[in-house]
Each structure stands twice: as C-alpha cells, then as structure tokens.
Amino acid sequence: MRRKILLLLLLLCLLLTSCTVNPSGAYNKAVESFANGEYADAAQAFEKLGDYSNAPTYAAYSRGLVLYDQGQYIAAEPNFAQVRDFMYGETRYQYCHGHVQESEGQHAEAAATFLALGDYEDAATLYRYNNARYAEANNDYETALYDYQMAGDYSDAATRLDTLRTLVYDQAVLLMAQASYEDALHLFTMLGTYYDSAEQARICKQHFRDARYAEAEILYNNGDLQGAYDIFISLTGFSDATTRAEEIGQMLGIELPNVE
C-alpha cells in the first residue's frame, strides 16, 4: 500500500511538473500560429501564457489583428494602442484612431491622421471624405464637392455629394434671380457639368459682363476715366471693350497691353 501511495505521489509530481515547467513550447507554438495568420488562435494561446516573455504584446497585437481583419477598426484601436512600438502597431493604431476620430465627428483631426498615413490601405480616400465633411461644415463648398467626388463610394460620400450639389445649385439660382451674377457664376462654375450648370454659368457670365460694361459707361460719362479704363480692360474680348480701353488709355497716356 505504501509503495502504491509513493508511486501515485511521484506520478502527480510529474504531471504537475509537465504543466508548469518550460512554457517555451507553448510560446513557440503560439508564435507559429501567429506567423501562419491564425491570429485568433495565437491571441488565445498568448493570453494563456500570461506574462511569459513578450506574450502580452503578441496577445494584444493578435487580438487587434482579428478585429482589424473584420473591419472593426474602432474596436481594434485599444489593442494597437498597447503595442504601438511593436511591428506595424503604430501604423495600424493611427489608421484605427482615424476611424475613431471620424466616428466622433472630429473630421479635421481624422483628415490629418489619414493624410499622414499616405498610401496606406485606403487612407487617401478616408482623408478625402473627412476633409469634405470638415469643408462642408465650414461652407467651403468647392473643396467639399471635389473631395466627396474623390471619396467615391466610401460611406455616404455619394449621397452627400448629390445633396451638396443640389444645395449649391439652388443657391446659385437664387443669386441669379437677385442679379448677383458674379456670385452665381462662381457657384455654377463650381458645379461643372451638373444638370444645366454649364449653360447657367454662360448666361450669368453674359449678364455679368453686360453689367460691368454698363458700369464702365457710367464711370466714363461721369469723368472717371481711370475707373472706366480698369473695367474695360478687364472685359478684354467682350463686345468692343478692348477698343474702348484703348481709346481711354490714349486719353490717359496709358499704353494698352499687347493681347495676342
């Protein structure tokens, strides 16, 4: 009986020793899983190793990669925040952090973050989208229109582009009705080929030139030759503005610039 008890105790010691001594085998197996792209298995294995070697670093990085590959960038950010100096941790952290900033409406900050990432992943597209959101919020419609278009089908960029185009077009029509032809011209030109923007821009340009020409005539009749000259010279190519500028220029002793 005593002999059996001793054998059982010896067997128990051997079992305990095999469980607690030399975790390097488990570590190496976890590293192999990581190298094979089996990040979920690797994360679980490294987490079981506790503080052994740099298992915590591998565990956080692997867990981050699992979420990253699933497109869960916001959820992955805290994991990469722990390992910013490990492998591609910093780059992946910045990419995920940009998504966090975007989700929180910090579009200027997100744009700066994605811009700094250069051609990493789709950072260039994400920069355009967030820059457009920031520009639109600050009434910089020209930048917003361009960047939404460059953002393509990311998120709701296409919908926002269409909505903004409609808004700008309606504003241009209102300005045109108010005879603010220069401002309307700017907006229609900004819209390019959207709807009939090109034709409306042409009409606004004609009205604007007519108005400026009439203004120059008034200045001339009131004796303001310099003011009339400045306007006529700016209208070079329109009606007889070039001839009028030349005539007034001779009266003022100004040589008309050569226009090819």
Report the location of each language-model feature:
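Positively charged n-region of N-terminal signal peptides that target proteins for export
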Residues: 1-5
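Alpha-helical tetratricopeptide repeat
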Residues: 23-34, 57-68, 91-102, 125-136, ...
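Alpha-helical solenoid scaffolds that mediate protein-protein interactions
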Residues: 48-50, 82-84, 117-118, 151-152, ...
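C-terminal motif of bacterial Sec signal peptides marking the signal peptidase cleavage site
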Residues: 15-18
